[in-house]
Every structure is written in C-alpha cells, then in structure tokens.
Swiss-Prot record:
The keyword Lipid metabolism applies. It catalyses: a 1,2-diacyl-sn-glycero-3-phosphocholine + H2O = a 1,2-diacyl-sn-glycero-3-phosphate + choline + H(+). InterPro entries: PLipase_D/transphosphatidylase (IPR001736), PLipase_D_euk (IPR016555), PLipase_D_fam (IPR015679), PX_dom (IPR001683). Its EC number is 3.1.4.4. Residues 208-379 form the PX domain. Keywords: Cytoplasm, Hydrolase, Lipid degradation, Lipid metabolism, Meiosis, Repeat, Sporulation. Residues 31-53, 1277-1289 have a biased composition (Basic and acidic residues). Its main location: cytoplasm. This is Phospholipase D1.
C-alpha cells in the first residue's frame, strides 16, 4: 500500500458510484489461518505510519511454495480484474518504504500489464519467445506484488466512499432564528400535535433539529452490561441552549431498541414503514479481548470520550471501524498479531451517541417517538422551566403510593387530596421543588412538593428475616422512597433502584444549589438577601400609584394577596383624569394581553365583617379567564372560624413586590396631609373641581362600617356632617430576589388552598420561581444596597405546617428591640402584648422585650428611648358607651392592660422595679381637624394609624402587615407577611449628641414619619433633600456580611459609605431648570389645595373652556410619560436624569423619571434648591399663608410652643429634640384639642360620668357654632370687606386658616372654662386663636383614660365577656 505525505493517490479518484459492501475484502476467504485478521481494533493514521513495515506480508523470492499457497488461498473476488495479477511479487528485500518511493513506477504498471496482454496475441518466433520468457521470469514476482498492492488500494477507496455514503448526515446545529426563517421548523410542533398514539396522546411538540446527544463518560463495571453511560442532552442553540445529563446502562439501550422493534413490527401491518436504525452490535461487550480491544475497566485518560462542547458530528467514524483503518484502507490482517489501539468504552459510548442521534432523526414523525423522548427525559414543562434558566434535574415516571398530610385530617379538608393513583406521574426535580405532572406533555402540575428546612428523602431499610449477621449489608428498597416537608409526606415508587438513586442524587445536587433547606435568621422560611433595591412609601397615594404602574408594566403574571380588594378602586386621582386606572380595568387589560392574574382574599363572614368578598370574586373572574380568585379560609372546613388571611402583598413578574399594611380597597387612599373633608361636588364641567374620595372611598369606620358595596359610587354618609377618618399607612417596594421569596410564599399558600378545597372553577397549581443569579441581577440592574429578609406568620390552618409554627415576624421584633442601643420607633394598629387580661395570658414577647431593654438601660444608666404610635381608638364601629361598642371596649381593655393598667402591664412591671416607664417609653396617636359644610362647622377626628413598622437605631426596619397582638405574631392565628431591611449604605448622624453611623433606608423613613406627624410639608422636603443628595443609587454588587443577632448585642453587619459602594453621582448638566421656573413653582405651591385637586389654584381658574381642558389633559398625560429607568428608580429611587420644561408645572413630579409614579408636586433643581417649608400646618393638613402669624405661646398652659425645622429630626434621642420638641408638641396639641373639642379619649375622662359630660359638651359646641354662623350671615358684607383689607383675618375655612380676628400680637389671653356646672364652650375668637397653636397632628395617647372604671372592673359588661378573647387580642 502507498502512503502519501500530501495529495491523493491515483485510486483516490475512483468514482463515488462504486459501492461495495463494507465487509468485502480480497483477504476475506476462510482458511487463511490468520486469526489476527479476525481481531481488529480501529487505529489512527499516525499509528499506521509508525508500524507500516508490519502492515504488508513479504515472502522469500525463491520460495514458490509459499507464493503459490498464498495465491491459491487468497484468490481475488473480482473476476474482471483477476488477470491483472502480475507474474512476480516483490522480494523480501523490498519494503513498503521502497515502494512508496517508487510511486511513479507503480502508476505505470497497469499500462505495462495491458501491453503484455496485447503482445500475447502476436505470432512470435520460438527463439524470440524463449528469450522473452526468460526475461519475464526475472520480474514476475515483483509485478504480481505490484498488482496485488494496486488491488488493495482500489478496494480501500471503494470502501471509503461507501462509508461516506452510508454515514448519517449529522449537521452542526444552526441558530434557532435561522431555522425558523426557513418556515418549516416553525410548523413542525403544530403538525406533531395531530400525530397521536393509540392512547390519544400527541407527540411532544419539540423541534428535533435542535436536539444534540453526546456520551460524555462511561463508568465501566466488571459486569459490562451494567456499565453506566453519562449522556448529555442539549436542546437549543447558542449560549441559551438547555443542557442536562442522564445516566443509562447498556441494557437500557437494548430495551429501548426492543420496544421500537415491536413498534416496527406493528407498523408493517398498517402500511407505514418505520425506518429503524440498526442497533450497533459492536457496542456489545462480548469477547472484547478476542476482538482486539484493550481490556481495561476504566477509561484511559489519553483516550477520552468526546468533549461536551463538541457536537456528535465531530466523532471520527473511521476510528470506530472493525474492518480496518477506514481512512487508509489498511486490511485487517495487516496488524500481524499486534494488539489493536483504542479504548472499547470510548468506542462503545460514541457509537451509542450516534445511534441515539439516528433514532431522533428517523422517528420524529412517529407517535412512538415519545418513548424515546422519555428515555432522554424530555417533557413540556421541564423544557419550559429550564428555558427560564432554572436547574434542570431528573425527570421520569413514578407511581404515587401515598399522599399523606396530617392537616387534611385535622382540618377536615381531605376532599381534594390525591391519596394514590395507579397511573404513574411524570416527576420533575426542579431547583427548589419536586413537580408531579399527569404526563410528559402536561404543562400544568398535578402537585408541587416545595422544599423547606424540614425536607428529607428516605428509603426504607430491609433486613432478611433469617439473617442474624449484623455485619451483613442492609438491603435497601429498590423501588419505593418517601419525601417529607413541613406540610405533607408522599410515598412514591419507581421502576428500579437505579432510577431511585439517580433521583436522590439529583435532589442532592439541587439542594446544594439552593438555600431553601437551610435554617435561616429569625427561623424564617426565607434566606437573607443582599444587594437589594428597596424603597419605602408612606401613605396610600404613593403606594397605589406605584402599584398601578407596576401592574401596568406586567408581562407574565400578577399575584395579589390581601385582606380586602375593591374591584372599583381608583388607583390614581383625580377620577376624571385617570379613569383607566381603576383596578378592575387595569387587570382586565393585562389579562387580555396574556398576563396571568392570581388573587387571594379573605373570605369574610358578612354578619361581622362586611367587605363582600363574594362580589370581588364574581366581578373579577367575569372579566377574563386569565383572572383567578380564591377566597379563604373555609371557616368550618379549615377550623378557622376566627382567623383571617391578613397579608398585604403584590408581586409582579416575580421581580417586584409590594409589602406593607395597605390593602387595595376603599377607605385606604390618603395623602400625607390627611385631609378630613371632601365636600365638593362630583365634578363640574371641566372635571377639575371634583371629589378625591368618591362614593365608598369616603369612609369613617368609627361612625359606620362599609355596606352596599355593589354600588361603589353611592355615598355612605352625609359629607356635610360626617368627616372622613384619615388613614396613615406605610408600605415598601422590593426589587430583585426578595420578590421571588415573596412569590414563593404566595405560591405555597395558593397551592395549599386549592388542595384544601377544590375551587368550582378549574384553577391551576403554581410553581415557585427559581432564584435569581448574581449575573441576572447585575445585568438587569436589580441591585441596591439593602439587606432584606422576608418574614411571615404561618401555621397549621393557614399553610398546613405540621409540628411547627412559623413566627419569624415576632422573632424579628423581639430581636430588634433587644439588640437596639439607643432608640426604637414603632407604628402599629394595635398594641396587645405580654400581659394578662380577663384571665387570659397574652403570650407574644414584644412587651417582655421592651421591659427587659428598659431595665437594662436603667441598670447601665443608658439613654434609651422608645416611641410607639397607635390609633387613639380601635377602628371599630360603635360608641364606647353603647352595647354595640363591646368589641371596641374589649380591645381597649387589652391594650391598656398591656401598657399601663395592672401589675402585668409594661409600666406596672417597671414600677415594681422602681423605674419610671414614661422616662423611656412614650405612646402617641394622631388627630386632625377640619371645616365641614357650608356653615364651616369645626370638627375633629382621629387619624387611624394602620402602619406596621419598627425602626431600631435608624439602622434596621421591619415593615409588613403584622399587628402587635396575638393574632398576628403567634403564627397559628392570622397569616402575615413582613420583611426586615438593613441598609448597608451608611450616613453620618447623631444619637444622644454623639456621632453615629445610621442606615440610609431606616434613617430617612423615620425622619419622614416624624416630619409628617409634626406638620412639615414632606413632599417638598423629600424633593429638597433629594436634590441635595445627588446620588444615583446605581451600585455594584458587593459581598455583604449579614447581620447575625446571635453573634453580638448590636445591630451590626457590613456598612459602607457611598464611595465604598462606588455609587455614581448625577451630572449637574442634567438639570435644566431656571430660577424663574423655581419661583413660579414656589408661588403656585402656596396656593395648591392638596385636599382634592392636583391643580394649583393659580392655574385652575384659567381652565374655563373645553379647549383649555383638552390642552390641560394633553399636558397632564404628557407629564406622566417618561423614559425608562433602572429598577432602583422605579418606585422612588434616584433617577438617572432630571429634565423639566419651562412651560409646564405638571412635569415637576416628585420622582422625575417615574413620571407615572407620583402626582405632580414640585420641580427639581440642584443649583436652586427647593426652599424649606417655613412652618408646619396646624392640624388640618393645609399650610397657612406666611403672613398669618402662628401662635407662639399656648394660652392654656402658658408654655412656649416649640419651633423646629427639617434639620431638627437628625437625633431622636437627645433631649433637645425628644423632650423640647417632639414631646412638647404632642402635649401642646393634646391640650388645645381638649380645650376646644373635648375629644374622646382623654386623660381627664376617668369615669362614665365625665364621659357623659363630654358628650353633652359636643352637642353644645355644635350649637354654638351654628350661632356663630348666624352672626356671620347677618354681618356678611362687613365681614367680606374686612377679609379683603386685613390679610391677618382670612375667611374661616376658605383656605383652612380659620376665621379669626386675631390681633397683630399672636398672644391671647388664657381662656376660661367651667367644670362644676358643665363645660363652657370657648368663644369663636379663642377657638381660632388656639387652632393657630397646633403643630401637625401628633397627640399623646391618654394612658389614664377611664382608669377609674377599669380598676373598679366597671369597664366591660357581662355581654362583652361572652365572645372568646382570642378573637380580639
């Protein structure tokens, strides 16, 4: 044979049409006696070059016996070429290297032989013939060897072309976009839908051209049929291709081929032939040594399988031949007994990979291809989940033997739980759960088994009954296993122990990639997440605006979990300018766009809680099939007659979540000013002078609870007589990984409710979203500077937790109080803790933590303070002295027993230790006043504190839906959700006059709340500080040391400055506002009536015509549009750029590039800072004109009213702020409200007798105001002229300034009142002078109210004690 260093040999030009069986060989006849020719291993071309002198047999020149014997035993198979064998062979002295050097000579050999054959037909004289024969005898052997060599080369070329013809066409995978441009691949999934097997199941709709299979490794075993192959399956192209590993044994391939042989036999009778590829017999592990393979049991490192990055088309087919080297055509016997090169396991694996690829290609249009897809672990849902970037684990069939949950029997809700099923499920091991589907084609899970800290998977141990040998290996069950979490136990059975072990291994790998099975801080279900973007929002205006924007931008799914949801709620105001922002219209629009909407609400009992959840469900589900609503709990079925789902949660696209105390329902919308009246008409011709709280949104639960909710725009009260009750609340927006933690909580509850009671409408189970990767967060700019952990209260009835109750919210509250160094700030709807009331022990430990912390501060002589804000009265309907006020009295009793009444209260326990509790802990509430109706009647109403927050040391904050009572904190009653936030971005501040590092999130939130309560214009202040800050919260990912409370006494963890976090600064050139625009906005802001309208009064009168209205609406809509911003700026973070126009005040929004996030307020300009508000409002939420003096001295107490500004709130502990400003303002406001309105509750009201006297005073005060109005009407003309000429005496109620005839001197005489024969009503002048002395809405919580009656056990009636106390505490 000839080996060329370059180019092709002559016989390489044999036409492709020459097709010979690959087993044909001129040396294939039996009887050669060369057994080494039977044993062949593929060898590489480099090996042939090294051993070329052994590849061709040689014979002695003078040994005709050997020659003739060789010729006779190996005749050529081609008769037409038989005569071409020459007259002689090469001698032994000639080797292949010599032949290779004489290629040109051998090339001429055919012509020489042909000429000789022609000469034989010519008549030659005898003498010449003898001479000629003598000359030919000398070269006969060499010529014959040359012919034989030529024949071998010719046949090798024929085999080479035949192999190329038979080789499968294995193409490199093209990009998916190129495949779909062809048109045909895109139609294949649809076509496969119509191909169905005998059971009616369609073919899995996948594109086979995107599948690649390769064997990466082989684990040999002595029993070689049990060798395990590691197979990589790839679906897709490019960097987003989905890859996973499966493990199969050789017998699995044999079983697979046997199945398809049976299918092929069936298809013969149907007239449709199945082109089944032949099973590669060379992979069978028999006679490995005799067949010439290296007998090794482990892979040779120098002869590895193909790399996972190579496609199957890169496999060298020539290296797999058993007939010889298919590249060179070397005959098999030419090895001359040499052991063949190549690892059998490598060849076996690669050959099986090629076999699988052929199967995929040939069977793609047969219904039985699903058997092959199940062999490769394909499924519709598995591909969908893996395409989202999640972990893709083991898949396969398993039979459910038992599905047991103790809650299903404890709570009598076992109607929908699947106990067993003979039909096997398709099981998918995902990143943090195990999914059960009806089959591999299903996209809806039949059950979802979510992992938690108690998750475990076990196999039952068996020991032979007759064996007593303890050293004997315990035999494990080969088929059954059990999985367990906090909710239930499932027993499953699989087809083999191998499959089970693979399943367990896959679960263990997934567990190593997730943190859901670990114990977390505060014993929460969720881990601590770092580098999170968070933004707080105070009051529902900001919350609802941002929620509406997030829902509007939803792309995949919306999850809403609330106590109440009003479908007709207007998310933005005014109504006429934002009619499309009604929540049912937004959800309907998104559902038509394909977004899935899932809503969970509390299933109310109409007789006690009139929120009409049935109306909510029926209305929303009637809008679109993509909207699903579940009401819960089923009170009797789940044994939850008294408990409620109290979470307030919105999750959009598993990326952004809103957590707090605000429900999306009537009565919650409010602004920081907390205006108490809204008596304007519904709308005028322009649509601008209209109500802010329309219909049921104008509410006062203290007067009357909600009713007739099917008519949402029908008023419940007379607006001219009943003020609304202001609603103060706090929420936050979290972006990034904690949003997926909140979504996981929602999914867990959603699935549990479906299993407890099957909905009337088919409702899908949900799958928890996978965790974000660091790259996904940074690439999507979903990072921030906060450390966030989601918390919850959950138990048996609410989440099906067995043998455990999660109370991580209570743990966080207690830990933050215990670890605080200087200060805590709490706002909550209730305060019932750590006491004994009516023989019932209150168990939650918040009160205990406060007592212990105060005792430690007193012992160590530390200055530690606590501020607690709660409503002045619970928000329940009814008068305190009437029978229907029983619930009100019972909750008040629990609260005062927790705070100050009795030896078990906080102050009682501190007094027993000789500690004055008021030195460390203060309780406050909120109250406002307003004018109602045409008579401008003065009224007061409390502002309901509904927030649920805790701030410790201005470093950490807890925000959520949990109240401080037994229902919310114990975990086995109401279900709650919250989050603890610690900002690693620190700023310089002070505590007790000393420098102190504080977290920016908690510090700014605490200042924002305190400023609002003391009456400062918070919107303007936020804008002013925002312009001064100049930071863009676009941060790099930072490795953070989380706060671990068990390792220290302080709230510690990583803390960084803006420079250390590499935070960017906004460019000054981005601000284009001029000083003229600033002055214009300043002037307009002074006349901005924030009660009901967004339009400054200086512009409102100019909008008179329809044309003006259209122009205004155009500008308004335009102002809401802004460029997209990063997630940190989405809900009140710092935008990337700020731009304003000189011709529009409506683009001057609170957060610039979130044009739809906040109502228009003020402009932004770093060069000309927004001026600080010069004065707080006087309790009614409206700022007085600067030329109207405020009262500087309280005429009742004779004390100076504190002066303060925005900079006074930095240090909440120092006496200069806490005692001289905060506490004194609250005391001053309380005194003024007491003197004017005789409010309930109050510290001077100790008995029922005094309570009745104060009620009579309220009637007399109302009558007295009517008399004032009559006097005004009789002197209307004189009063009008006086109000125009005297700026210090504006019309009462016209701008909220009151109608007063105050002198230039702001001091007034101390008013006189009678208390012996009834309380005297002060005159008009005194009343309005006193109102000018109120600062903000902060008042003291009266701790002595009705204490005499409470101590005498005369506070609660016998009827009040009938209901269980657990309902209220």
């Amino acid at each position: 044979m000839t080996i060329h260093q370059g180019g092709n040999s002559v016989i390489d030009n044999v036409p492709y049409s020459l097709n010979t069986n690959v087993n044909d060989s001129i040396y294939s006849e039996k009887g050669t006696g060369r057994k080494d020719a039977e044993d062949h291993t593929p060898s590489k071309i480099t090996d042939l070059e090294k051993n070329v002198d052994h590849s061709i047999p040689s014979f002695p020149e003078n040994d005709p016996k050997n020659y003739s014997e060789f010729v006779n035993l190996n005749p050529p198979k081609r008769p037409d070429l038989e005569h071409t064998r020459g007259s002689s062979w090469h001698t032994a002295s000639e080797n292949v290297n010599d032949l290779a050097a004489n290629d040109s000579t051998r090339v001429q050999t055919p012509e020489f032989i042909t000429q000789t054959m022609e000469d034989e037909n010519v008549e030659v004289p005898p003498l010449e013939r003898d001479e000629r024969d003598a000359a030919a005898a000398h070269t006969s052997k060499a010529n014959r060897n040359s012919a034989r060599q030529m024949w071998a080369q010719l046949m090798a070329s024929v085999r080479k072309f035949k192999r190329e013809d038979e080789k499968p066409i294995l193409k490199e995978n093209l990009p998916a976009i190129n495949l779909f441009e062809a048109g045909i691949p895109a139609s294949l999934p649809i076509a496969k839908h119509f191909i169905r097997d005998k059971s009616g199941q369609p073919v899995l709709p996948i594109i086979t051209d995107l599948i690649k299979v390769s064997v990466l490794d082989v684990e040999p075993k002595h029993n070689r049929i049990h060798s395990t192959f590691t197979i990589q399956v790839e679906y897709g192209t490019g960097p987003h291709a989905i890859r996973w590993l499966i493990y199969r044994q050789l017998r699995d391939f044999i079983n697979l081929h046997s199945h398809f042989l049976f299918f092929e036999f069936q298809h013969r009778f149907s007239g449709r032939r199945m082109k089944l590829p032949k099973f590669p017999k060379e992979v069978l592990p028999y006679l490995v040594k005799l067949r010439g393979y290296q007998k090794i049991l482990y892979s040779n490192p120098s002869d590895q399988l193909i790399d996972e990055t190579h496609s199957i088309s890169d496999i060298s087919w020539e290296s797999h031949s058993q007939d010889g080297d298919r590249t060179t055509g070397q005959p098999r016997h030419a090895n001359n007994g040499r052991k063949k090169h190549g690892n059998f396991w490598t060849i076996q694996g690669n050959t099986l990979g090629v076999y699988l690829q052929e199967m995929i290609h040939n069977l793609q249009f047969f219904p039985e291809v699903n058997v092959l897809y199940s062999f490769l672990e394909f499924s519709s849902l598995g591909l969908y989940l893996a395409g989202a970037g999640t972990f893709h684990g083991k898949e396969g069939f398993a039979t459910l033997k038992r599905n047991y949950s103790p809650t299903q029997y404890m709570l009598c809700c076992n109607t929908t739980m699947m106990k067993t099923r003979s039909q096997p499920f398709w099981i998918i091991v995902s990143e943090s759960c195990i999914i059960l589907c009806d089959n591999m084609l299903s996209m809806q899970p039949a059950d979802v088994f979510i992992w938690d800290v108690d998750f475990e998977i076990t196999r039952k141990n068996f020991r032979k009954a007759h064996s007593k040998d303890t050293n004997e290996k315990i035999r494990l069950s080969h088929h059954s296993f059990k999985i367990k979490n906090r909710q239930k136990v499932m027993k499953l059975s699989v087809r083999s122990g191998r499959w089970l072990q693979q399943f367990i291994n896959s679960v263990q790998v997934a567990q190593g990639l997730t943190a859901w099975c670990e114990i977390h801080r505060f014993d929460s279900f969720a881990p601590v997440r770092t580098n999170v973007a968070v933004q707080w929002m105070v009051d529902a205006r900001d919350h609802m605006w941002n929620v509406s924007r997030a829902i509007k931008n939803a792309k995949r799914c919306i999850m809403i979990h609330g106590w109440w949801l009003s479908p007709e709620l207007q998310m933005r105001r005014p109504y006429s300018m934002a009619h499309k922002w009604r929540i049912d219209r937004i959800l309907n629009e998104k559902a038509h766009e394909g977004v899935m909407v899932y809503i969970m609400i509390y299933r109310n009992i109409d007789a006690t809680i009139p929120i009409d959840s049935f109306h909510t469900k029926e209305h929303l589900q009637s809008l679109h099939p993509n909207i699903y609503v579940i009401r819960s709990p089923s009170h009797f079925r789940q044994n939850a007659l008294f408990w409620a789902h109290h979470e307030k949660l919105v999750v959009v696209d598993d990326a952004i979540t809103f957590i707090g105390g605000i429900d999306l329902c009537f009565g919650r919308y409010d602004t920081p000013q907390h205006i108490l009246y809204d008596d304007k008409p519904v709308a005028d011709k322009t649509g601008l002078c209209e109500q802010t709280w329309r219909g049921k949104d104008y509410s006062n639960a203290r007067v009357h609870d909600f009713f007739d909710l099917t008519e949402p725009y029908k008023d419940m009260y007379d607006r001219l007589a009943v003020p609304r009750m202001g609603w103060h609340d706090v929420s936050m927006c979290i972006i990034g990984q904690p949003a997926r933690d909140a979504a996981r909580h929602f999914v867990q509850r959603w699935n549990y409710l479906i299993q407890c009671k099957k909905p009337a409408r088919k409702t899908p189970l949900l799958i928890p979203p996978p965790d974000f990767t660091t790259d996904q967060l940074t690439d999507s700019q979903l990072t921030g500077t906060c450390e966030v952990q989601v918390l919850r209260s959950a138990g048996l009835w609410s989440l099906g937790l067995v043998d455990t109750v999660e109370q991580s919210i209570q743990n966080a509250y207690v830990t933050c109080i215990e670890k605080s160094e200087h200060f805590i700030y709490i706002e909550n709807q209730f305060f019932v803790t750590s006491t004994t009331c009516e023989g019932t022990t209150i168990e939650n430990r918040v009160g205990d933590a406060l007592v212990e912390r105060i005792i430690r501060a007193h012992k160590n002589n530390e200055k530690w303070r606590g501020v607690i804000m709660i409503p002045l009265l619970p928000g329940f309907e009814g008068q305190i002295d009437l029978q229907e006020g029983g619930s009100l009295r019972l909750i008040v009793e629990c609260q005062y027993r927790s705070i100050c009444h009795g030896e078990h209260s906080i102050f009682g326990r501190l007094n027993a230790k000789g500690i004055d509790g008021s030195k460390y802990l203060r309780f406050y509430g909120l109250r406002g006043w307003a004018h109602l109706g045409e008579n401008h009647e003065l009224v007061t109403e409390m502002i309901y504190v509904h927030a649920k927050i805790l701030i410790a040391d201005d470093r950490v904050a807890v925000i959520g839906s949990a109240n401080i009572n037994e229902r919310s904190l114990l975990g086995n009653r109401d279900s709650e959700i919250a989050a603890v936030i610690r900002d690693t971005l620190t700023i310089d501040s002070k505590m007790d006059g000393k420098p102190y590092k504080v977290g920016k999130f908690a510090h700014t939130l605490r200042k924002r709340l305190m400023r609002e309560h003391l009456g400062l214009e918070t919107d303007v202040l936020e804008q002013r500080e925002y312009n001064m800050d100049g930071l863009d919260r676009d941060t790099e990912w930072k490795r953070v040391e989380v706060w671990t409370p068990d390792e220290g006494n302080a709230i510690n963890g990583s803390a960084y400055t803006a420079e250390e976090l590499k935070m960017k600064y906004r460019s000054q050139s981005q601000f284009t506002t001029t000083p003229d625009i600033l002055r214009k906005a300043e002037k307009s802001m002074k006349k901005l009536d924030q009660r009901v309208s967004l339009i400054p009064s200086s512009i409102e009168f100019n909008i008179k015509t329809q044309k003006d209205k259209v122009e205004f609406e155009k500008n308004y809509e335009k102002s809401k549009k802004g460029p997209d911003v990063i997630a940190n700026a989405l809900v009140g973070g710092i935008p990337l750029s700020l731009k304003t126009k000189e011709d529009s005040l409506y683009e001057l929004s609170k957060f610039s590039q979130c044009g739809e996030d906040q109502r228009p307020m003020v402009l932004k300009d770093p060069d000309h800072l927004v001026p600080e508000p010069s004065r707080p409002h006087c309790g009614n939420g409206l700022v007085f004109y600067d030329d109207i003096p405020l009262l500087e001295v309280n005429p009742i107490s004779g004390e100076t009213i504190p002066k303060f500004d925005a900079s006074s709130f930095e240090d909440p502990v120092c006496d200069e702020f806490f005692e001289d400003i905060w506490s004194k303002v609250a005391s001053n406001n309380t005194t003024i409200y007491r003197h004017i309105f005789r409010c309930v509750p109050d510290d001077e009201m100790l008995t029922w007798e005094s309570y009745n006297e104060w009620k009579k005073y309220g009637k007399r005060f109302k009558e007295e105001q009517a008399r004032w109005r009559q006097e005004e009407l009789s002197n209307l003309h004189e009063t009008h002229e006086k109000s125009e000429n005297d700026p210090k005496n504006p019309k009462a109620g016209s701008q909220g300034s009151g109608n007063t005839s105050a002198s230039e001197d702001s001091k007034t005489e101390k008013p006189k009142t009678r208390t012996n024969n009834g309380l005297q009503v002060p005159d008009k002048r005194v009343v309005y002078d006193l109102l000018r002395g109120i600062r903000g809405q902060l008042v003291e919580l009266p701790l002595k109210w009705m204490s005499t009656e409470s101590n005498a056990r005369n506070w609660l009636s016998s009827i009040d004690k009938i209901p269980p106390l657990e309902i209220y505490d």
